Swiss-Prot record:
GO MF terms, alphabetically ordered: DNA binding; DNA ligase (NAD+) activity; metal ion binding
Function in brief: DNA ligase that catalyzes the formation of phosphodiester linkages between 5'-phosphoryl and 3'-hydroxyl groups in double-stranded DNA using NAD as a coenzyme and as the energy source for the reaction. It is essential for DNA replication and repair of damaged DNA.
Entries under Pfam families matching the protein: BRCT (PF00533), DNA_ligase_aden (PF01653), DNA_ligase_OB (PF03120), DNA_ligase_ZBD (PF03119), HHH_2 (PF12826)
UniProt binding sites for NAD(+): D36, H37, V38, Y39, D40, S85, M86, E115, R138, E172, K287, K311
BRCT domain location: 588-671
Catalytic activity: NAD(+) + (deoxyribonucleotide)n-3'-hydroxyl + 5'-phospho-(deoxyribonucleotide)m = (deoxyribonucleotide)n+m + AMP + beta-nicotinamide D-nucleotide
GN (gene name): ligA
Keywords: DNA damage, DNA repair, DNA replication, Ligase, Magnesium, Manganese, Metal-binding, NAD, Zinc
Cofactor(s) listed: Mg(2+); Mn(2+)
Active site: K117
Protein name: DNA ligase
The organism's taxonomic lineage, starting at the top: Bacteria, Bacillati, Bacillota, Bacilli, Lactobacillales
Length: 671
């Protein structure tokens, strides 16, 4: 504690200024500058000082505010019922103190509904006569931002309820670990800055002025609060069950628990499970289950008295940087990676951490031999948070960023205002290798047996220089590869030959054009039907397709204007590679799945999720990630959870994996 009032005043001023700056970066710019636990420690210190020196309390203090200011670029929304923040604690002892306060106020023990604390962005959904009227962020708690146009592109948000009710529900908008990793990879390869964690990726994606951007970002929601629920709903647990029946996406891991011992067991359970969940959680939330008791307990100016968040302690380890490796991606972006002494962190052994670009490397001032603090950003990505300067070797020297490509030796450049460092040599062996590996990948041409090691050998032995060369390989060529015998040779040649029959969207995606992902390739192929028309399409024609923006359109037109691209397409066509769209007009003739919206859930025994999705899409189905009234069919495997229950509640047709395969085989038999 500060020794005098004057010292306390000075520390409070410093803390408020620092916390205001950090909160602005976190809530308003979606670009955090410190880890959550650092913010929490400073915030707790400010609370401690304000409690000790009542004369230092101020209505302007961040401890008396909710969230951040409202983004002036988005329409403002006034919340009829304020969207409050939550108090938080960091130990089981503090949870016990919360429970004692509740019992003292109520006069007897209470049951709690315990929920996972999803690391996302607070969201309000208002319905009028059963139709979505407005969606808004929390903002400062009193006034939020109108994000209705963007929320319409979040698949698990119902646009219409099965009952014509006027109501409001609230929850969390989040980005799954898979979607986050994919988004950051795409941004990294494009030379764009990456998001620090899934929470900020979700916030930045939801608060877009262009809804098309939101649509591409694969956001999800968990709904957990019903404002003024209908008569007969008496508890938080019951409210969540009833909201699920209305079609809202709720979290299946919530439980009604009668005592703190069970709550502690729940915390221990999900402390162990958190790494295996498909989304990020940063704690658990304890809520008095009885809604009448919630009303009796009421709120402070900032937080409800009937709920509290228990936040997981940060996992951070120290290790030593031994090397900084530079790798070249298929688009030419050169990325530094710190190679470190292996250390156990958040459920896995970590020995490498991306430094992303030269700017970050310089900002952190990482040097060989440095001891660094390592954590997992969003519980997913190993990341260096800082250098432990007190342990820096005396003979340490600043790290020099290379000026030559580590693969081909050509000069490295910065394009326009990119932070990324690039090799722009189209013949760079590393780029060629990455490009061919991508072309052969399961998501693209799906050439079984043609992985990175085989591609590396093919290039090293001068057998291929681009993707078209694959279709001119012979058995004699492949016999030159190490450990490649007759069976392996025949299998690879068959796989290459089969890939000639793929639909053109897989070829387009396989070319690895900047910013053109699998979904974009499919939309473009569906519109133009063949590669010739795609290659000659104008920017205006491309952007007329829903969700295709200027970035994708310009990348495509620039690529197809290159002479090398024209020659490559000609050689692919000469090799018999299909250049036509085989979707709705071809393979997807009449069949059970054609035109249906299908959801997959549970563990599939015969195919990976991606393989099954491709099969259904080839039959003309639309595969989505969440169950709603618009879902035509649910295909489920083992351990199917909330999606199956929701489909049953909505009376949506359901097929086991075996039944779905039987339907697919019926289609194959008809061919």
């Amino acid at each position: 504690m500060a020794e005098s009032l004057e010292e306390a005043k000075q520390e409070v001023r410093q803390l408020r200024a620092q916390l205001d700056q950090w909160a602005k970066a976190y809530y308003e710019q979606d670009a955090p500058v410190v880890e959550d636990h650092v913010y929490d420690e400073k915030y707790a210190r400010l609370l401690e000082l304000e409690a000790a020196y009542s004369e230092l309390k101020s209505a302007d203090s961040i401890t008396q505010r909710v969230g951040g200011e409202v983004n002036s670029d988005l329409p403002k929304v006034e919340h009829p019922v304020p969207m409050l923040s939550m108090g938080d604690v960091f130990s089981k002892e503090e949870l016990a103190e919360f429970d004692q306060r509740v019992q003292k106020a109520i006069g007897h023990p209470v049951a709690y509904n315990v929920e996972l604390k999803i690391d996302g962005l607070s969201l309000s959904l208002e319905y009028e006569e059963g139709r979505l009227k407005r969606a808004s962020t929390r903002g400062n708690g009193q006034v939020g931002e109108d994000v209705t146009k963007n929320v319409k592109y979040i698949k698990d948000v119902p646009q219409k309820l099965p009952k014509a009710i006027t109501t409001e529900v609230r929850g969390e908008c989040y980005m799954s670990k898979e979607a986050f990793a994919k988004l950051n990879q795409e941004r990294d390869e494009a030379g764009e800055s990456i998001f620090a964690n899934p929470r900020n990726a979700a916030a930045g994606s939801l608060r877009q002025l262009d809804p098309k951007v939101t649509k591409k970002r694969q956001l999800s929601t968990f709904i957990y609060t019903w404002i003024n629920p209908p008569a007969g709903i008496d508890s938080q647990h019951q409210a969540i069950c009833e909201m699920a029946k209305l079609g809202f996406h709720t979290n299946e891991n919530g439980r009604r628990l009668e005592n703190l011992a069970d709550v502690y067991d729940y915390i221990d359970e999900f402390t162990k499970k958190r790494d295996s969940l498909p989304y990020v959680i940063d704690g658990i939330v304890l809520k008095v289950d009885d809604l009448a008791l919630q009303a009796d307990l009421g709120n402070t100016v900032k937080v409800p008295r009937w709920e509290i968040a228990y936040k997981f302690p940060p996992e951070e380890e120290e290790t030593v940087v031994r090397e900084i490796e530079w790798t070249v991606g298929r688009t030419g972006v050169v990325t530094p990676t710190a190679v470190m002494d292996p250390v156990r962190l958040a459920g896995s052994t970590v020995a490498r951490a991306s430094l992303h670009n030269p700017d970050l490397l310089a900002k952190l001032d990482v040097r060989l031999g440095d001891t660094v603090k390592l954590h997992k950003a969003g519980d997913i990505i190993p990341e260096i948070s800082e250098v432990v300067l007190s342990k820096r070797p005396e003979d340490s020297v600043p790290y020099e960023v290379p000026t030559k490509c580590p693969s081909c030796g050509e000069d490295l450049v910065h394009l326009d205002e990119e932070v990324a460092l690039r090799c722009i040599n189209p013949s760079c062996p590393a780029q060629v290798e990455e490009g061919i590996t991508h072309f052969a990948s399961r998501q693209a041409m799906n050439i079984a047996g043609l992985g990175p090691k085989i591609v590396k050998q093919l290039i090293a032995k001068d057998l291929v220089h681009n993707v078209a060369d694959l279709y001119y390989l012979t058995a004699d060529d492949l016999s030159q590869l190490d450990h490649f015998k007759e069976k392996s040779i025949n299998n690879l040649l068959v796989a290459i030959d089969q890939s000639r029959k793929n639909s053109v969207e897989l070829v387009l995606f396989g070319l690895g054009i900047d910013n053109v992902g699998g979904k974009a390739a499919q939309l473009i192929a569906r519109k133009f039907k063949n590669m010739s028309k795609i290659a000659s399409a104008s920017v205006q024609e491309l952007t007329a397709i829903d969700t295709i923006g200027m970035t994708i359109a310009e990348s495509l037109t620039t690529y197809f204007q290159q002479e090398e691209a024209k020659k490559l397409l000609a050689r692919l066509e000469e090799a018999g590679v299909n250049m036509d769209y085989l979707g709705e007009d071809g393979e997807a003739a009449d069949n059970f799945f054609k035109g249906k919206t299908v959801v997959l859930t549970g563990k599939l025994a015969h195919y990976s999720r991606a393989e099954f999705t491709k099969k259904l899409q080839a039959l003309g189905a639309k595969v989505t990630g969440s169950v709603s009234k618009k879902t035509d069919c649910l295909v489920y495997g083992e351990d199917a959870g909330s999606k199956l229950a929701k489909a049953e509640a909505l009376d949506i047709p359901r097929l086991t994996e075996a039944e779905a395969i039987s339907k697919i085989e019926e289609k194959d038999t008809e061919k």
